Amino acid sequence: MKEFIFPMKIYWEEKDKNYGRFVVEPLERGYGTTIGNALRRVLLSSIYGSAITAVKIEGVQHEFSTIEGVQEDVLQIIANLKNVRFDLKDSDLEILYLEKNAPGVVLASDIKTPPNVTIINKDAYIATINSANTTLKMEIRIERGKGYVMSDEMEQIGEAGWVVLDADFSPIKVAAFRVEATRVGDRTDYDKLTFELTTNGVVSPDTAIQQAVELIVKHMNMLTNISYEVPTLPEPMPPDELMEKLTFSIEELDISQRALNSLKRIGVTTIGELVQLTEDELKSSKNIGRKALTEIKEALKNMGFSLGMNIGEQRSSEV
């Protein structure tokens, strides 16, 4: 019986801080495409990075404004800000500040950052101030995340003047591969996989590959012990226990800090207050995005609750 072939050569053909190309050979026929596709999909969708998610410019109410004494309009300034690359560590969110009150070019290096935030491309252009009487002052919210997130899925900010942005968190700019035939002994129908990727400089190519492989292996390992169990329905919670949970703080909900902050901004402090709100009422609040709403509904479901409940009816059913 023919032995299964495993790779004998795995090496980087070229690698620097932004670009890398490596080779894996030989592989059984079809495995080049299988491995290449898996790596590419995980790299583009699941590697964490940092991005600007909202900006507040002093004196500006919306993104279609202009700023007297500044060459660019707000839309162009936002587009330029999106080109600034950040490395955010030990935190999921930070607010950065920029203030410039002299004529000249405004660069990413003018942004004030805490110790856990590094600007990768400090020479990135943001705007030009043309007037000595103009001050460009802004707050910039950056967050960690993965993939591409639309602005309506972001945590909304109730305070006036903030513009919430679409965010491309992925540090991977290009991920591509090709599969060629390679020889093992007399056979020439084995695969040679050549994979290349370009990052934005926040992560190196080898680190990105390592993270992607670890994610794939972790998922595959979970499939080594497949068992089928008929799901059992949870025992219904006693009414008095349900009523007690209604008095709990929303801090008890298994939701992200982002979703928790969104609820606090609209004045919700207890689970009882939350369950009396309908889904439409939460949707109509600019503080609650689609992602936060999904988290809230799932957390309530796990506790035996749902949105739009009539607590009065619940109490009367106990009597």
Curated annotation (Swiss-Prot):
Q: Look up the domain of life of the source.
A: Bacteria
Question: Which Enzyme Commission numbers does its entry carry?
Answer: 2.7.7.6
Please give the catalytic activity noted in the UniProt record. RNA(n) + a ribonucleoside 5'-triphosphate = RNA(n+1) + diphosphate
Give the main EC class. Answer: transferase
Q: SMART domains, alphabetically?
A: RPOLD
Q: Which InterPro entries match?
A: DNA-dir_RNA_pol_insert, DNA-dir_RNA_pol_RpoA/D/Rpb3, DNA-dir_RpoA, RBP11-like, RNAP_asu_C, RNApol_insert_sf
Single GO MF descriptor: DNA binding
- Sorted alphabetically, which keywords does the UniProt record give? DNA-directed RNA polymerase, Nucleotidyltransferase, Transcription, Transferase
Pfam families, alphabetized: RNA_pol_A_bac, RNA_pol_A_CTD, RNA_pol_L
Q: Which GO terms describe its cellular component?
A: cytoplasm; DNA-directed RNA polymerase complex
Segments for region (Alpha C-terminal domain (alpha-CTD)):
242-319
The UniProt entry, under Gene3D superfamilies, shows: 5' to 3' exonuclease, C-terminal subdomain, DNA-directed RNA polymerase, insert domain, RNA polymerase, RBP11-like subunit
Question: GO:BP terms for this protein?
Answer: DNA-templated transcription
Q: Extract the ranges annotated as region (Alpha N-terminal domain (alpha-NTD)).
A: 1-227
Spell out the family assignment given in the record's similarity comment: Belongs to the RNA polymerase alpha chain family.
Domain annotation text? Answer: The N-terminal domain is essential for RNAP assembly and basal transcription, whereas the C-terminal domain is involved in interaction with transcriptional regulators and with upstream promoter elements.
Under the heading NCBIfam families, the entry gives: PRK05182.1-2, PRK05182.2-5, rpoA
**Its quaternary structure?**
Homodimer. The RNAP catalytic core consists of 2 alpha, 1 beta, 1 beta' and 1 omega subunit. When a sigma factor is associated with the core the holoenzyme is formed, which can initiate transcription.
- Biological role: DNA-dependent RNA polymerase catalyzes the transcription of DNA into RNA using the four ribonucleoside triphosphates as substrates.
The name of this protein is DNA-directed RNA polymerase subunit alpha
Native species of this protein?
A: Hydrogenobaculum sp. (strain Y04AAS1)
Taxonomic classification:
Bacteria, Pseudomonadati, Aquificota, Aquificia, Aquificales
